[in-house]
């Protein structure tokens, strides 16, 4: 058989497949009574993957106009049912363990990076205990102790980094904030031993581990691809480093002072069954904290600086807020070092963070595997076990229905639109302390339900100290000819600004203004 003939048959087969797919969708729409509407697509398996992957929020909003808040699309061959709005967030993120499962969705991707027996590679009951261990490592006392550590890291970086050499210049702020946030998290959470390695071997290991979050790994997490081989080698080496740190601390015994960092906390933890937290699991939890927290902190801090550069007047408002509300007991009547209590007197700082999180959350989709057929209250729909559920809390955060002129960055909106206060019915204890379910709110930057981020307080504190410190020392503005902020890059599992994202900076003549 000649190649032209083979090509002709292949083309005919392709056309036939598309025709059958379109026919199936037509019949599905005509005859279906209990499934959510299916988003139209030409090519089987691919479905709506490209549109969703390139612009998830554009995809969500366009589908909502056509199909309503509940619809199903094909994501790499997997029927994925989206339920938008606060009711959708409640339905998916507060689903019962027997009905929805996060582990089956995320474990293939996260386990090679984070390690075994933690997060999504263990029963939910064990994960709840691990979250409790971490939460108590983020106590009020620990958070207060973190403030001077974070401030020092930022000041040292601004003083010594080539990115901020001289009195003014330009900087790729995404690269700078990636370095700053890994240093601040390293110093505050990881301990001095890890922090001392962040500029050398750890930086390479972090980079190689980070490649494990490549989107293709949702489909092929164990494929012998070059980036996966580097990921596995980096994980093994990073685990060995943590275990070595733990062993040295144990061997030092009473000769080492009690530490407020997370490693010191985890070394004292014991499961309910009496088993001490194994060193391997301590190492894997520490890797998880480093990798998971760094992405969101790096992304959102970059967005904050880009937003401030696009509105330099807000930078000056922040600086004046510090001058008006904080002690000036430093040299030459300059601002005193930051303390935890200071941020109660800096509402605009908090609102800048809150507003940037609203517009630029780094995770646009939260998924759960359906384990039992799920009737959707108030609808005729029943979601089958072959589907994955997708919640997109960012959709309500970007909706004019909840936030007038929602696409505008306006930190002052929070002066009159405070976050919804939790009522008694919204409080739940999943096993690691009472928290808000959060799902009734249109603003969920840290997720909701049993998988809500427990590092929320540290994240806010870390960002607040970084912003306050940088505003004390620098002014920001866009480069000549640039307006607004860069577009969002959705090519990674964790979205962020398109790179490079350059802004102009200028040192203040004196801290006291």
From Swiss-Prot:
It is an enzyme of class 1 (oxidoreductase). Heme binds at residue 453. One of its GO terms (cellular component) is membrane. One of its GO terms (molecular function) is iron ion binding. GO terms for biological process: sterol biosynthetic process. Keywords: Heme, Iron, Lipid biosynthesis, Lipid metabolism, Membrane, Metal-binding, Monooxygenase, Oxidoreductase, Steroid biosynthesis, Steroid metabolism, Sterol biosynthesis, Sterol metabolism, Transmembrane, Transmembrane helix. It comes from the Eukaryota. Pathway: Steroid biosynthesis; sterol biosynthesis. InterPro entries: CYP450_sterol_14alpha_dmase, Cyt_P450, Cyt_P450_CS, Cyt_P450_E_grp-IV, Cyt_P450_sf. It is found in: Membrane. It catalyses: a 14alpha-methyl steroid + 3 reduced [NADPH--hemoprotein reductase] + 3 O2 = a Delta(14) steroid + formate + 3 oxidized [NADPH--hemoprotein reductase] + 4 H2O + 4 H(+); a 14alpha-methyl steroid + reduced [NADPH--hemoprotein reductase] + O2 = a 14alpha-hydroxymethyl steroid + oxidized [NADPH--hemoprotein reductase] + H2O + H(+); a 14alpha-hydroxymethyl steroid + reduced [NADPH--hemoprotein reductase] + O2 = a 14alpha-formyl steroid + oxidized [NADPH--hemoprotein reductase] + 2 H2O + H(+); a 14alpha-formyl steroid + reduced [NADPH--hemoprotein reductase] + O2 = a Delta(14) steroid + formate + oxidized [NADPH--hemoprotein reductase] + H2O + 2 H(+). Its main location: membrane. The chain crosses the membrane at residues 3-23. It is a single-pass membrane protein. Pfam families: p450 (PF00067). Its EC number is 1.14.14.154. Its cofactor is heme. Belongs to the cytochrome P450 family. Sterol 14-alpha demethylase; part of the gene cluster that mediates the biosynthesis of the tetrahydropyranyl antifungal agent restricticin that acts as an inhibitor of CYP51 and blocks the ergosterol biosynthesis. Sterol 14-alpha-demethylase plays a critical role in the biosynthesis of ergosterol, the major sterol component in fungal membranes that participates in a variety of functions. Rtsn2 acts as a self-resistant CYP51 that contains mutations found in CYP51s isolated from azole resistance strains and that is not inhibited by the final product of the cluster, restricticin. This is Sterol 14-alpha demethylase rstn2.
